[in-house]
Regions:
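A short, glycine-centered helix-capping/turn motif at helix boundaries
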Residues: 46-60, 147-149, 160
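Short basic/aromatic active-site micro-motif
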Residues: 129-147
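Catalytic-site neighborhood detector that most strongly recognizes the C-terminal catalytic loop/helix
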Residues: 23, 75-79, 158-184
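Active-site/catalytic core of tyrosine-dependent DNA strand-transfer enzymes
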Residues: 25-29, 87-129
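Short, polar N-cap/turn motifs at the start of nucleic acid-interacting alpha helices
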Residues: 65-70, 130, 149-171, 192-194
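Basic, Lys/Arg- and aromatic-enriched nucleic-acid-binding interface segment
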Residues: 3-55, 137
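Conserved tyrosine-mediated DNA breakage-rejoining catalytic core shared by Y-recombinases
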Residues: 11, 50-53, 59-96
Length: 194
């Protein structure tokens, strides 16, 4: 008697779903900057100015994360270290909403990051229906690429690997390329300078 092998997934067809587009056009992000002034909307704008920092990372920041004019932190999702030059536009928001124990007071007002995220997203939805914190990172990346910043610099700014993890250990990335890319994105969005 022969045994027929079966697999639990036999006959199942898998579809790869593409990631939902979560980027704003330049005009749309400009309109969010124009609507700014509310603390929670300004947290979204700060996320954009900081190359799309995640809410959980922003929530966890303390004053010790600012070192010699740079924001130094390890991303909670990946553990990867980030070092972002604090441009004046970001510093203005940080100064306006500085916390006592945390870098930003919104981190002290909410019980946890999940509550903070829900509240930010509710406020953003009033500015633009469907807008969430995820848009900050996606929008920064799309604008950077569309104004001519090389894809490898965009990837470096977002903390993506260069493909071979072993190679990454040998590469000492020039952060000035990321600093310049972020300055170009900010200048284009806020001052229409390409």
């Amino acid at each position: 008697m022969s045994r027929r092998k079966t697999t639990p997934s036999a006959g199942i067809v898998y579809r790869l779903e593409t990631t939902k587009k979560r980027d704003l056009s330049v005009e749309e992000i400009r309109s969010v900057f124009e609507a700014g002034g509310d603390e929670l909307v300004d947290m979204f704008l700060l996320m954009f100015l900081l190359i799309g920092i995640n809410v959980s990372d922003l929530f966890a920041l303390t004053k010790e994360n600012i070192v010699r004019g740079r924001l130094e932190y390890d991303r909670a999702k990946t553990g990867r270290h980030y070092s972002i030059l604090l441009h004046p536009e970001a510093l203005r928001i940080i100064e306006k909403y500085k916390g006592e124990n945390k870098l930003l007071r919104f981190s002290e007002h909410f019980r946890n990051v999940d509550v903070a995220t829900v509240m930010i997203n509710k406020k953003l939805a009033k500015v633009r229906p469907g807008l969430t914190t995820y848009y900050a990172r996606h929008t920064w990346a799309s604008i950077a690429f569309n104004i001519g910043i090389q894809k490898d610099v965009v990837s470096l700014a977002l903390g993506h690997s260069f493909g071979v993890r072993v190679t990454d250990t040998y590469i000492n990335a020039d952060l000035s390329r990321v600093d310049e890319a972020n300055r170009r994105v900010i200048d284009y969005v806020l001052y229409n300078k390409k």
